[in-house]
Amino acid sequence: MRVALVAGEHSGDRLGAGLIRAIRARCPEAEFDGVGGPLMQAEGLRSHYPMEALSVMGLVEVLRHLPRLLRIRRDLVARYRTDPPDVFVGIDLPDFNLSIERRLKAVGVPTVHYVSPQVWAWRQGRVRTIGRSVDRILALYPFEAEFYRRHGVPVDFVGHPAADRFPLQPDAGAARAALGLVDDGGGPWVALLPGSRLGEVQRHAELYARTVARLRERQPDVRFIAPLAWPGLRAVFYEALVQQGVSDAVQLFEGRADEVMAAADVVLTASGTATLEAMLLKRPMVVAYRLAPLTFWLMKRLVRVSHVSQPNLLAGEGLVEEYLQDAATPDNLAYALYRLLNDEPRSAYLRARFAELHGTLRRGADGQAAAAVLAAAGGNGS
Protein backbone atom coordinates (compact mmCIF):
# COMPACT_ATOMS: atom_id res chain seq x y z
CA MET A 1 0.00 0.00 0.00
CA ARG A 2 1.39 3.37 -1.06
CA VAL A 3 -0.29 6.61 -0.07
CA ALA A 4 0.66 9.95 -1.63
CA LEU A 5 -0.10 13.06 0.43
CA VAL A 6 0.44 16.78 -0.20
CA ALA A 7 0.19 19.41 2.55
CA GLY A 8 1.31 23.03 2.33
CA GLU A 9 1.16 24.56 5.80
CA HIS A 10 1.55 23.77 9.48
CA SER A 11 -2.11 22.91 10.12
CA GLY A 12 -2.07 20.49 7.19
CA ASP A 13 1.20 19.00 8.40
CA ARG A 14 -0.43 18.21 11.74
CA LEU A 15 -3.50 16.70 10.07
CA GLY A 16 -1.31 14.65 7.77
CA ALA A 17 0.82 13.33 10.62
CA GLY A 18 -2.27 12.09 12.47
CA LEU A 19 -3.63 10.52 9.30
CA ILE A 20 -0.36 8.70 8.56
CA ARG A 21 -0.25 7.37 12.12
CA ALA A 22 -3.82 6.09 11.91
CA ILE A 23 -3.30 4.48 8.48
CA ARG A 24 -0.15 2.73 9.67
CA ALA A 25 -2.02 1.37 12.70
CA ARG A 26 -4.43 -0.31 10.28
CA CYS A 27 -1.94 -1.08 7.51
CA PRO A 28 1.59 -1.44 8.96
CA GLU A 29 3.23 -2.03 5.57
CA ALA A 30 1.94 1.26 4.12
CA GLU A 31 4.44 3.66 2.54
CA PHE A 32 3.98 7.43 2.29
CA ASP A 33 5.44 10.08 -0.01
CA GLY A 34 4.50 13.51 -1.33
CA VAL A 35 4.99 16.93 0.25
CA GLY A 36 4.79 17.55 3.98
CA GLY A 37 6.46 19.23 6.90
CA PRO A 38 8.44 17.98 9.89
CA LEU A 39 5.49 16.30 11.61
CA MET A 40 4.55 14.22 8.57
CA GLN A 41 8.17 13.41 7.88
CA ALA A 42 8.61 12.24 11.48
CA GLU A 43 5.78 9.77 10.84
CA GLY A 44 7.56 8.37 7.79
CA LEU A 45 6.61 10.60 4.84
CA ARG A 46 9.24 10.98 2.13
CA SER A 47 8.81 14.62 1.07
CA HIS A 48 9.83 15.54 -2.47
CA TYR A 49 9.80 19.29 -1.74
CA PRO A 50 10.01 21.46 1.39
CA MET A 51 6.49 22.17 2.58
CA GLU A 52 7.33 25.89 2.78
CA ALA A 53 7.55 25.95 -1.03
CA LEU A 54 3.75 25.62 -1.09
CA SER A 55 2.97 27.84 1.91
CA VAL A 56 1.57 30.91 0.16
CA MET A 57 -1.63 32.74 1.13
CA GLY A 58 -3.73 35.39 -0.63
CA LEU A 59 -4.46 36.06 -4.28
CA VAL A 60 -1.69 38.61 -4.71
CA GLU A 61 0.88 36.47 -2.89
CA VAL A 62 0.02 33.40 -4.99
CA LEU A 63 0.57 35.35 -8.21
CA ARG A 64 4.04 36.34 -7.03
CA HIS A 65 5.04 32.70 -6.54
CA LEU A 66 3.02 31.18 -9.39
CA PRO A 67 5.93 29.92 -11.57
CA ARG A 68 7.36 27.88 -8.67
CA LEU A 69 3.96 26.47 -7.74
CA LEU A 70 3.21 25.43 -11.32
CA ARG A 71 6.59 23.75 -11.67
CA ILE A 72 6.06 21.69 -8.51
CA ARG A 73 2.54 20.77 -9.56
CA ARG A 74 3.70 19.58 -12.98
CA ASP A 75 6.39 17.43 -11.40
CA LEU A 76 4.00 15.81 -8.91
CA VAL A 77 1.40 15.03 -11.58
CA ALA A 78 4.04 13.51 -13.86
CA ARG A 79 5.55 11.54 -10.97
CA TYR A 80 2.22 10.03 -9.89
CA ARG A 81 1.02 9.30 -13.42
CA THR A 82 4.25 7.43 -14.10
CA ASP A 83 4.24 5.60 -10.77
CA PRO A 84 0.67 5.76 -9.43
CA PRO A 85 0.03 5.50 -5.68
CA ASP A 86 -2.85 3.42 -4.36
CA VAL A 87 -4.55 6.64 -3.27
CA PHE A 88 -3.75 10.35 -3.40
CA VAL A 89 -4.71 12.58 -0.46
CA GLY A 90 -4.65 16.34 -0.89
CA ILE A 91 -4.63 18.01 2.53
CA ASP A 92 -6.23 21.45 2.34
CA LEU A 93 -4.44 23.75 -0.19
CA PRO A 94 -7.38 23.44 -2.62
CA ASP A 95 -6.21 25.58 -5.53
CA PHE A 96 -3.04 23.49 -5.70
CA ASN A 97 -4.29 20.05 -4.73
CA LEU A 98 -7.58 19.93 -6.63
CA SER A 99 -5.77 20.41 -9.94
CA ILE A 100 -3.50 17.47 -9.09
CA GLU A 101 -6.48 15.39 -7.97
CA ARG A 102 -8.40 16.07 -11.17
CA ARG A 103 -5.50 14.96 -13.34
CA LEU A 104 -4.84 11.84 -11.27
CA LYS A 105 -8.49 10.82 -11.05
CA ALA A 106 -8.65 11.03 -14.85
CA VAL A 107 -6.05 8.25 -15.09
CA GLY A 108 -7.68 6.07 -12.43
CA VAL A 109 -5.88 7.08 -9.23
CA PRO A 110 -8.34 7.23 -6.28
CA THR A 111 -8.37 10.76 -4.86
CA VAL A 112 -9.39 12.09 -1.44
CA HIS A 113 -9.40 15.72 -0.36
CA TYR A 114 -8.91 16.20 3.38
CA VAL A 115 -10.31 19.54 4.63
CA SER A 116 -13.13 21.01 2.61
CA PRO A 117 -12.36 23.92 0.32
CA GLN A 118 -14.44 26.87 1.50
CA VAL A 119 -16.92 26.62 -1.37
CA TRP A 120 -19.74 27.30 1.07
CA ALA A 121 -18.17 30.73 1.63
CA TRP A 122 -17.15 31.83 -1.86
CA ARG A 123 -16.90 30.61 -5.47
CA GLN A 124 -19.67 28.07 -4.85
CA GLY A 125 -19.55 27.02 -8.49
CA ARG A 126 -16.34 25.16 -7.63
CA VAL A 127 -18.42 22.36 -6.10
CA ARG A 128 -18.87 20.90 -9.60
CA THR A 129 -15.11 20.92 -10.17
CA ILE A 130 -14.58 19.31 -6.78
CA GLY A 131 -17.08 16.57 -7.62
CA ARG A 132 -15.17 15.82 -10.83
CA SER A 133 -11.77 15.91 -9.11
CA VAL A 134 -12.18 13.77 -6.00
CA ASP A 135 -13.69 10.46 -5.02
CA ARG A 136 -14.38 11.71 -1.51
CA ILE A 137 -14.20 14.85 0.64
CA LEU A 138 -13.23 14.52 4.30
CA ALA A 139 -14.93 17.42 6.10
CA LEU A 140 -13.89 18.70 9.50
CA TYR A 141 -17.14 20.53 10.22
CA PRO A 142 -20.79 19.44 10.09
CA PHE A 143 -22.00 22.43 8.05
CA GLU A 144 -19.48 21.53 5.34
CA ALA A 145 -20.74 17.95 5.08
CA GLU A 146 -24.32 19.21 4.75
CA PHE A 147 -23.28 21.51 1.88
CA TYR A 148 -21.64 18.69 -0.09
CA ARG A 149 -24.54 16.31 0.45
CA ARG A 150 -26.92 18.91 -0.97
CA HIS A 151 -24.72 19.04 -4.08
CA GLY A 152 -24.31 15.28 -4.45
CA VAL A 153 -20.58 15.13 -3.65
CA PRO A 154 -19.47 12.08 -1.60
CA VAL A 155 -18.39 13.33 1.83
CA ASP A 156 -17.51 12.08 5.31
CA PHE A 157 -17.77 14.34 8.35
CA VAL A 158 -14.77 13.04 10.30
CA GLY A 159 -14.65 15.73 13.00
CA HIS A 160 -11.58 17.75 13.83
CA PRO A 161 -8.41 16.12 15.22
CA ALA A 162 -7.81 19.13 17.44
CA ALA A 163 -11.13 18.46 19.18
CA ASP A 164 -9.84 15.00 20.08
CA ARG A 165 -6.48 16.36 21.21
CA PHE A 166 -7.67 19.14 23.50
CA PRO A 167 -9.21 18.26 26.88
CA LEU A 168 -12.81 19.21 27.51
CA GLN A 169 -11.68 21.00 30.70
CA PRO A 170 -8.35 22.81 30.10
CA ASP A 171 -6.16 23.65 33.08
CA ALA A 172 -4.88 27.24 33.01
CA GLY A 173 -2.80 26.75 36.15
CA ALA A 174 -0.97 23.75 34.69
CA ALA A 175 -0.30 25.64 31.45
CA ARG A 176 1.13 28.61 33.35
CA ALA A 177 3.35 26.33 35.40
CA ALA A 178 4.61 24.57 32.25
CA LEU A 179 5.51 27.93 30.73
CA GLY A 180 7.20 29.15 33.91
CA LEU A 181 4.69 31.97 34.40
CA VAL A 182 4.23 33.25 37.93
CA ASP A 183 0.59 32.67 38.86
CA ASP A 184 0.69 35.05 41.82
CA GLY A 185 -2.76 36.54 41.67
CA GLY A 186 -1.51 39.53 39.69
CA GLY A 187 -3.17 40.97 36.61
CA PRO A 188 -4.86 38.91 33.89
CA TRP A 189 -2.97 37.28 31.03
CA VAL A 190 -3.65 38.13 27.38
CA ALA A 191 -2.26 35.85 24.66
CA LEU A 192 -1.24 37.48 21.37
CA LEU A 193 -1.30 35.32 18.21
CA PRO A 194 -0.49 37.48 15.18
CA GLY A 195 -0.32 34.55 12.74
CA SER A 196 1.78 31.59 11.69
CA ARG A 197 3.04 32.90 8.33
CA LEU A 198 5.64 35.60 7.79
CA GLY A 199 3.27 37.79 5.77
CA GLU A 200 0.63 37.62 8.49
CA VAL A 201 3.04 38.58 11.24
CA GLN A 202 4.47 41.41 9.14
CA ARG A 203 0.96 42.82 8.61
CA HIS A 204 -0.10 42.38 12.24
CA ALA A 205 3.02 43.06 14.31
CA GLU A 206 2.68 46.84 14.62
CA LEU A 207 -1.10 46.58 15.11
CA TYR A 208 -0.73 44.11 17.96
CA ALA A 209 2.12 46.05 19.56
CA ARG A 210 0.10 49.27 19.51
CA THR A 211 -2.87 47.37 20.94
CA VAL A 212 -0.67 46.27 23.85
CA ALA A 213 0.21 49.90 24.51
CA ARG A 214 -3.43 51.03 24.37
CA LEU A 215 -4.65 48.23 26.64
CA ARG A 216 -1.95 48.96 29.21
CA GLU A 217 -3.20 52.54 29.34
CA ARG A 218 -6.69 51.27 30.21
CA GLN A 219 -5.59 48.43 32.50
CA PRO A 220 -1.93 48.67 33.59
CA ASP A 221 -1.82 45.29 35.36
CA VAL A 222 -2.49 43.23 32.19
CA ARG A 223 0.30 40.77 31.31
CA PHE A 224 0.98 39.58 27.77
CA ILE A 225 2.33 36.33 26.32
CA ALA A 226 2.89 35.50 22.65
CA PRO A 227 3.88 32.28 20.84
CA LEU A 228 5.79 32.62 17.56
CA ALA A 229 6.24 29.44 15.54
CA TRP A 230 9.85 30.05 14.45
CA PRO A 231 12.71 32.52 15.08
CA GLY A 232 12.05 34.64 11.98
CA LEU A 233 8.52 35.40 13.15
CA ARG A 234 9.77 36.14 16.64
CA ALA A 235 12.29 38.68 15.28
CA VAL A 236 9.64 40.54 13.27
CA PHE A 237 7.22 40.68 16.20
CA TYR A 238 9.88 41.67 18.73
CA GLU A 239 11.04 44.56 16.53
CA ALA A 240 7.48 45.93 16.47
CA LEU A 241 7.25 45.65 20.26
CA VAL A 242 10.53 47.55 20.61
CA GLN A 243 9.37 50.30 18.25
CA GLN A 244 6.19 50.77 20.29
CA GLY A 245 8.08 50.73 23.59
CA VAL A 246 6.31 47.63 24.96
CA SER A 247 8.93 44.91 24.54
CA ASP A 248 9.22 44.59 28.32
CA ALA A 249 5.47 43.92 28.61
CA VAL A 250 5.29 40.84 26.38
CA GLN A 251 6.89 37.47 27.12
CA LEU A 252 7.68 35.63 23.87
CA PHE A 253 7.73 31.88 23.36
CA GLU A 254 9.00 29.89 20.40
CA GLY A 255 6.00 27.74 19.50
CA ARG A 256 3.92 26.32 22.37
CA ALA A 257 0.81 28.12 21.11
CA ASP A 258 -1.57 25.66 22.77
CA GLU A 259 0.01 26.18 26.19
CA VAL A 260 0.14 29.94 25.75
CA MET A 261 -3.56 30.13 24.89
CA ALA A 262 -4.46 27.75 27.72
CA ALA A 263 -2.54 29.96 30.15
CA ALA A 264 -4.34 33.13 29.07
CA ASP A 265 -7.53 34.69 30.34
CA VAL A 266 -8.29 36.24 26.94
CA VAL A 267 -6.79 35.76 23.47
CA LEU A 268 -6.17 38.25 20.66
CA THR A 269 -5.69 36.20 17.51
CA ALA A 270 -5.51 36.36 13.76
CA SER A 271 -8.26 34.41 12.00
CA GLY A 272 -7.53 30.83 11.03
CA THR A 273 -6.77 27.64 12.93
CA ALA A 274 -5.84 29.58 16.07
CA THR A 275 -9.46 30.68 16.49
CA LEU A 276 -10.55 27.04 16.56
CA GLU A 277 -7.84 26.13 19.06
CA ALA A 278 -8.72 29.05 21.32
CA MET A 279 -12.34 27.88 21.21
CA LEU A 280 -11.35 24.30 22.09
CA LEU A 281 -9.34 25.68 25.01
CA LYS A 282 -12.48 27.62 26.09
CA ARG A 283 -10.69 30.95 25.91
CA PRO A 284 -12.70 34.12 25.20
CA MET A 285 -11.14 35.83 22.20
CA VAL A 286 -11.02 38.84 19.93
CA VAL A 287 -10.19 38.21 16.27
CA ALA A 288 -8.19 40.73 14.23
CA TYR A 289 -7.00 40.22 10.68
CA ARG A 290 -5.52 42.24 7.84
CA LEU A 291 -4.89 41.09 4.28
CA ALA A 292 -2.96 42.73 1.46
CA PRO A 293 -5.28 45.56 0.29
CA LEU A 294 -5.93 44.12 -3.18
CA THR A 295 -6.59 40.65 -1.75
CA PHE A 296 -9.10 42.09 0.73
CA TRP A 297 -10.82 44.12 -2.00
CA LEU A 298 -11.26 41.00 -4.11
CA MET A 299 -12.37 38.83 -1.18
CA LYS A 300 -15.05 41.34 -0.15
CA ARG A 301 -16.66 40.90 -3.55
CA LEU A 302 -16.44 37.11 -3.58
CA VAL A 303 -17.12 35.93 -0.02
CA ARG A 304 -20.70 34.93 0.83
CA VAL A 305 -20.48 34.47 4.61
CA SER A 306 -20.84 36.99 7.42
CA HIS A 307 -18.07 35.62 9.66
CA VAL A 308 -14.46 34.48 9.24
CA SER A 309 -13.54 32.86 12.58
CA GLN A 310 -14.19 29.18 13.22
CA PRO A 311 -16.29 29.67 16.39
CA ASN A 312 -18.67 32.00 14.58
CA LEU A 313 -18.93 29.74 11.53
CA LEU A 314 -19.65 26.72 13.72
CA ALA A 315 -22.18 28.56 15.85
CA GLY A 316 -23.84 30.28 12.92
CA GLU A 317 -23.74 33.56 14.84
CA GLY A 318 -21.33 36.26 15.99
CA LEU A 319 -20.14 34.69 19.23
CA VAL A 320 -16.74 36.38 19.12
CA GLU A 321 -15.90 39.87 17.93
CA GLU A 322 -14.10 40.10 14.58
CA TYR A 323 -12.18 43.18 13.45
CA LEU A 324 -11.09 42.99 9.83
CA GLN A 325 -8.88 45.25 7.73
CA ASP A 326 -9.67 48.93 8.48
CA ALA A 327 -11.75 47.99 11.54
CA ALA A 328 -8.66 46.34 13.05
CA THR A 329 -7.30 49.37 14.89
CA PRO A 330 -5.39 49.49 18.19
CA ASP A 331 -8.20 51.43 19.86
CA ASN A 332 -10.91 48.98 18.74
CA LEU A 333 -8.91 45.93 19.76
CA ALA A 334 -7.80 47.33 23.11
CA TYR A 335 -11.37 48.27 24.01
CA ALA A 336 -12.72 44.87 22.94
CA LEU A 337 -10.10 43.08 25.05
CA TYR A 338 -10.76 45.39 28.01
CA ARG A 339 -14.48 44.59 27.88
CA LEU A 340 -13.84 40.85 27.80
CA LEU A 341 -11.38 41.01 30.67
CA ASN A 342 -13.91 42.82 32.82
CA ASP A 343 -17.16 41.05 31.88
CA GLU A 344 -17.12 37.66 33.62
CA PRO A 345 -20.76 36.78 32.73
CA ARG A 346 -19.95 37.23 29.04
CA SER A 347 -16.75 35.20 29.36
CA ALA A 348 -18.61 32.42 31.21
CA TYR A 349 -21.24 32.32 28.46
CA LEU A 350 -18.54 32.03 25.78
CA ARG A 351 -16.81 29.21 27.65
CA ALA A 352 -20.10 27.29 27.89
CA ARG A 353 -20.88 27.74 24.19
CA PHE A 354 -17.34 26.77 23.24
CA ALA A 355 -17.74 23.54 25.25
CA GLU A 356 -20.92 22.70 23.30
CA LEU A 357 -19.20 23.30 19.98
CA HIS A 358 -16.20 21.24 21.11
CA GLY A 359 -18.50 18.25 21.62
CA THR A 360 -19.83 18.39 18.05
CA LEU A 361 -16.29 18.08 16.63
CA ARG A 362 -14.97 15.33 18.92
CA ARG A 363 -15.34 12.21 16.74
CA GLY A 364 -11.98 10.41 16.58
CA ALA A 365 -11.01 12.23 13.39
CA ASP A 366 -7.67 10.55 12.64
CA GLY A 367 -9.23 7.09 12.71
CA GLN A 368 -12.27 8.11 10.70
CA ALA A 369 -10.11 9.81 8.08
CA ALA A 370 -7.81 6.78 7.84
CA ALA A 371 -10.77 4.44 7.34
CA ALA A 372 -12.13 6.66 4.56
CA VAL A 373 -8.74 6.85 2.80
CA LEU A 374 -8.27 3.08 2.94
CA ALA A 375 -11.82 2.57 1.66
CA ALA A 376 -11.08 4.91 -1.26
CA ALA A 377 -7.96 2.90 -2.06
CA GLY A 378 -10.21 -0.17 -2.19
CA GLY A 379 -8.62 -3.17 -3.81
CA ASN A 380 -5.56 -1.17 -4.85
CA GLY A 381 -3.82 -1.72 -1.54
CA SER A 382 -1.51 -4.63 -0.97
Swiss-Prot record:
| Keyword annotations | Glycosyltransferase, Lipid A biosynthesis, Lipid biosynthesis, Lipid metabolism, Transferase
Top EC class for this record: transferase
A Gene Ontology BP annotation from the UniProt entry: lipid A biosynthetic process
Q: Which EC number(s) does UniProt give?
A: 2.4.1.182
- Which Pfam family is one of this chain's hits? LpxB
User: Gene3D superfamilies, from UniProt?
Assistant: Glycogen Phosphorylase B
* Record carries keyword Glycosyltransferase: yes
Entry's Gene Ontology cellular component terms: membrane
Recall the GO molecular function terms of this protein's record. lipid-A-disaccharide synthase activity; phospholipid binding
- What SUPFAM superfamilies has UniProt attached to this entry? UDP-Glycosyltransferase/glycogen phosphorylase
Catalyses:
a lipid X + a UDP-2-N,3-O-bis[(3R)-3-hydroxyacyl]-alpha-D-glucosamine = a lipid A disaccharide + UDP + H(+)
* Keyword Glycosyltransferase among UniProt keywords: yes
Cited function: Condensation of UDP-2,3-diacylglucosamine and 2,3-diacylglucosamine-1-phosphate to form lipid A disaccharide, a precursor of lipid A, a phosphorylated glycolipid that anchors the lipopolysaccharide to the outer membrane of the cell.
Similarity comment text for this entry: Belongs to the LpxB family.
- Supply the name of the protein: Lipid-A-disaccharide synthase
**Gene that encodes it:** lpxB
